[in-house]
Structures are given as C-alpha cells and as structure tokens.
Amino acid sequence: MDGTETRQRRLDSCGKPGELGLPHPLSTGGLPVASEDGALRAPESQSVTPKPLETEPSRETTWSIGLQVTVPFMFAGLGLSWAGMLLDYFQHWPVFVEVKDLLTLVPPLVGLKGNLEMTLASRLSTAANTGQIDDPQEQHRVISSNLALIQVQATVVGLLAAVAALLLGVVSREEVDVAKVELLCASSVLTAFLAAFALGVLMVCIVIGARKLGVNPDNIATPIAASLGDLITLSILALVSSFFYRHKDSRYLTPLVCLSFAALTPVWVLIAKQSPPIVKILKFGWFPIILAMVISSFGGLILSKTVSKQQYKGMAIFTPVICGVGGNLVAIQTSRISTYLHMWSAPGVLPLQMKKFWPNPCSTFCTSEINSMSARVLLLLVVPGHLIFFYIIYLVEGQSVINSQTFVVLYLLAGLIQVTILLYLAEVMVRLTWHQALDPDNHCIPYLTGLGDLLGSSSVGHTAAVPRRCTASPGWGLIQPFICTQHLIVSLLSFYFPFCLLAKTSI
C-alpha cells in the first residue's frame, strides 16, 4: 500500500509510545512528494521531528507472536506437505511424463501464486493495521482494485513463466513442439488466473475477519495463503494440463484460452485504476515479480532434471515443503517490518533504530526490538516444523520416503540456513526499499520468495543425494555430511553477496 494513505489511529486504551518501549512515530510535517518513477519521498525542506501523538503501537510479546504464528504456520505446513505428496503423485501422470517442461513450470507458477497472494496479504494487512479498510466505501475500493491488480499480474506473469520454462527446456533439449508450447502456455495462464482469484478472495476474508477479531493479520494471512495456495495451484495445474492433454486434437482450444484471458486484461486494468497506489504498482511493480519468476524458474529446472533420477529420490516431495516454509516465514517477517515502517515513519525516512542499511546479524535476531523478537520466533519454528512435516509425510508415504539420519540432519540444517539468510535479507531489503521510498510489500516479498525457491530446490538436491553415497562408501559417509554442509553454506552465501553489491549500487 502507498505511504500517502497511511493513517495512524488514536486509541484510548493505548499508552504512549515511550511507555511501551517503542520509538516515537516520525512525521515529515506534510505529505510525501511523488517522484517521476512513482516513488514517494518526503519533502527535503521538512525536518523529521518526533510526533507527540498517541498511536496504535504493537503490544505484542514473544509469546503472543508465537501463539498467533504457530497455528497458521502448522496449518500451512500441512498444506505444503500434501502439496509435496501431490507433486510426487502428479509427476507420473501422462501429461507430466510427456511434457517435461510442466515440472519446470511448478516452482515459478507456485512461486507466482505466493508472490501475488503474499504481497496482496501484506498490502491488505498494512491497510487493516493502519485503519484504511475500516470505512466501508474505502474498503470496497481497496479490495476491488487489489483483486483486479493480481488478475493482471497473474495473466501476464503466468504467460511469461511458461515462456521461461520453454526457453530453459529448449536450451537443455534443443527441440520445440508447437502443440506442447500451446498446452504449456494455456495451462500456465488458466492456472494462474484461477489460483489468483480463489486465493485473493480468501485473503480478503481472512484479513477482514482478523481485523474484526482483533488479531494481527500480518501473523496469519500469509501462512494461511501458503497452506492452501500450493495445494490449490498444483491441483489446478494438474487438472487443467491433463484436460488440455486429453483434448490435444482440438487445434484451436489452447490458443483461444490464451487470447480470451489476454482480452480480459484491459478490464482488470480499468478496475485497478480506481486506486492511485495500485496505478503506481501497475506502472512500476512488474520488475520484482518478473525477476522472482525468473529466479524460481531455475529452481524448476533443477527439479525437472533431478525428480526422475533415483539418486535424487525425495525431490518431488520435499521441494514444495522447504521452498514453501522459507517463503512463508520470510513473507511474514517482511510484512511485519513493512507495517511497522508504515505506522512509525514516512516513505524515504528510516526510524532512528533502523538507520543502518546493513545491520549486524546479531541485531536482527538478538535484540529486544519487536522485529527482532518476531525473527527469533520465526527462526525457532523451522526445525520443529520441518520435523513434524517430515513425520507426517513419512506416515503417509511409508518406505518410499528417504528416512536416513544423514538426510534428516542435513535437510533440517539446510532449512535452518535458508530461513536464517532469508530473514536477514528481509531486514536489509526492507530498509533499502523504504529508504528509496518504495513499498516493501510490493518490492521485497517477490525477490525473497523467489530466492527461497532457488535455495530450497538446490538444498534438497544436495541433501537427497547424500544417503546413497553414504551407502555406497562407508568411509565417504563419515565425511560427506560435513562436506555437504560446507557446500550448502557456500552455495547459499553465493546468492547473498551479489545481492549486496547490487543493492549498494542502487543507493
């Protein structure tokens, strides 16, 4: 949501910020000025001074955050576990066997759902926490424009995801089948549209319901979106692609589907334009979700190349779980930090305690600040969460799941490293984007979830291959966990440092 619409509400029951151990909200003395690129900046002539108004600060504690996050997180994990088992089942369907690029399409398409729904949930949560959807007329405008926006994004990026999957397939196989191209494009666009609509309506209901119940939507909206999102998206993709595969003799069916949804795009644009902040996203918000889709596509390539190989047994089941858990947790943290900045500062102006663009990692996880508290809670959920999800998958799948101690330990370590890096990057990216007067809800979550997909896919690929090597060579099995752990850390950090250099050049 846009910084110009941020409202601070006075509540008689709330104490002053100083009494709660929180910094005073900042005021620029006026409305931000829009720049040519659509970003909002505070006027330079206006100084940032403490604003002695009572606001609606967060009274959350570690326990309250944990209680609110844990239940939806576990519910989300169940959905991710079922999604992994469904993917393991769907990979043997004729359409997935015949059209290999469908597996390449899974991470970017599921990631697209995550990007759209999590950014939607984050925008709506910020709007709810700042009081913008309390007025019925304003609520209708915000909801309709946001739903129309994600339909535009789903149609365009769904088509681009299919193109990316095809290009990666061409590079590796050097062959193009026009019928398969049409099937892939139609399946991607229709799946993206249906999933975006269903999950968008669900997000609206969750945020409004949470607001009425007095629960922070930031803590529950994104986990619930993740719990059903992957399951719904995978199911729709499998059913839609199988339908087109059965009717592959109907020459004009798939092109007609693509053209029909393309023709609806101007209608969604007109509806979305009733909200000025959404207009800015339509103009300038494409790069994050497209780049995130490209990053996720490489994770899809890893999945498609390894899922059918015996030495990578478990890729199909555990890839959605580790990718979904990482993206879920980092989206919660990003949404919380974004809401904090919308409530306590103005676009382009960082609070005093967040002035450093590159904070010490210890300050991200080990201080008494509310964002550090939430980061600790989210990090503590990783290992027990993955253990529970692994046990559920093992109970359902039985002996078909890798259950060696080496795999379990490395899998948990990979998930812990992945989430640690993502949570730290969330802190850095939100500060950088807010300093540039950009909305973190729209610019950070796509990058972080896309990176989480790539890190998750590569991590599962490394860990899945270890048990067989251990069995083949007992001596190798003793040292392989340490070598693989070192390789995982180096691989994950190799994605972090290029981002640091890129971000520094943009300041």
From Swiss-Prot:
GO terms for molecular function: magnesium:sodium antiporter activity. It catalyses: Mg(2+)(in) + 2 Na(+)(out) = Mg(2+)(out) + 2 Na(+)(in). It is found in: Mitochondrion inner membrane. GO terms for cellular component: mitochondrial inner membrane; plasma membrane. Disulfide bonds: none annotated. Keywords: Ion transport, Magnesium, Membrane, Mitochondrion, Mitochondrion inner membrane, Transmembrane, Transmembrane helix, Transport. The keyword rRNA processing does not apply. It is a multi-pass membrane protein. Pfam families: MgtE. InterPro entries: SLC41_membr_dom, SLC41_membr_dom_sf, SLC41A1-3. Gene3D superfamilies: SLC41 divalent cation transporters, integral membrane domain. The keyword Magnesium applies. Na(+)/Mg(2+) ion exchanger that acts as a predominant Mg(2+) efflux system at the mitochondrial inner membrane. Belongs to the SLC41A transporter family. This is Solute carrier family 41 member 3.
